């Protein structure tokens, strides 16, 4: 870059940073003073109105809104300060020169910053309509759309990018085509060093279209590993929060991901963009949050482990319960229950029948016959509550008379009545809960009945397996979707109307029924679905999911930015698919190496010593948790800093890690070492997809060890795509 251009940009940066510092100083002084005043006012109000009479209550009611207004103003100013402090660290990352009626230079950053007296904008928020021009892929004619939906044509004369630290200008790039390879790689340092970071400075044109898309309420984003699906989704969340800031907040958006560990891994992205983190969850946590489903269920990761070792009937059960055929059958079965066959429990208190299953059926099919199933059941609940109160009152009186006749109870009549009520309330509590929670409907019988009614030899075996699991009070993961859906349709659920948008990561691992259950839980939500059909951990039939969303756009990202060209080519060859277009750097080819078992620890230690440095990340992957634990026990004395990542892990850790391959999905590491790539271990139908996921975690270095015979999934890869070495 020519010196006079550099000097000019440095002067501009210095001026902007000085203005930012001035605003920050003013706000810090204001907030310090405001905080002190608020504390004093709260203490004064608390002291003065500690004893509220009617008259003083009126005074308190007039003071409270004023105090609340001051607190809201404090929160708002503090939010503005946080954004200015972000800008102070790196004021902007881009500049575009556009010609409308006149030539204008616009600087693009994480938030808007302007002159208060003139209203002139010094830094444009990257999410503003005009900032979309920065992410276009060419100079010349372009347009942007303003909120009134008016199209504004402009000429883009220059696109410039910066790397900035406080008031220091580190790098300048001029790009005719937005972020060419050289610029992209200068800006995209190895991100596998830490938690996921924002990609706002390196958003590509195809990614920008996804982030800003408003043509459909729902979107499915498909793409290979490293295409930025999750990163784009996080930027899309930030964009939606900006675009709809008057009606949408972080508490209205939910991200459903495979694990709490992954939620922690991405937890820095939105704060880096000046936004609060959204609501994070997992499918398993949604199940646990539902009332009236008391049985323990295995987690997603426990399910993966079980299926890796499962016999044929367990595998058939998983595929069958996740199939579209069963989903369609279950939906029809539930509709049929409106006419006949809904199973009820008889409710009793002690040995005395409170209401029989026969009477419940009479109420359901005769008295409330014209209503939806869940409304009928709520009518029955309302019908039973007066009877319950009457039974309790009679029981209390009987117990009171009993206590009066027993010498050991000493006390007056009030004491005896109080004791009677306490005992009866405790005795009737289970019955009260059963009525309140519609526990008189046999949900498990509905579920098992829907399986048995398929009337095939396969269904019969799966029915018997499911019965055994229910008796053991331990559900499989594949039971969660059907049971949550049945619960929602039959008993109804506490629907969350606050969530307006949901991002589901790894949608390829969700069944149709799981998705239907999520829709039931969050009826007001629109969806952004992220997936890659080749990264299947739990194979399900998922083609039906996008069909459930009437207004949906399906977008495919076909470029990978994560790994070197060599690793990306190797990854593509695992599944014998067309090469994924890699925009990564050039690097060393993957190493596929046979080692003797006796040398395994020495070889792994050598890899760690050669490839691991501070501010990089290295992971050792095995197929399952048992193998990881065994290897960890062998390595922990020779590599003291190694950390085993378990299924229960909730906090992402940096450094040298060891974890099962299925847990690595979504993460990226500078170096990946697959420690057990033998045919005897990876020989299942879906193991090639697991290996595809495992190799695609590496950004710079990929090493694969095997002991006897390399798995067929990797053996079929052409030899010029990797290096080999055999130890004698």
Label every PLM stretch briefly:
Residues 241-502, 509-517, 525:
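Alpha-helical nucleic-acid-binding subdomain
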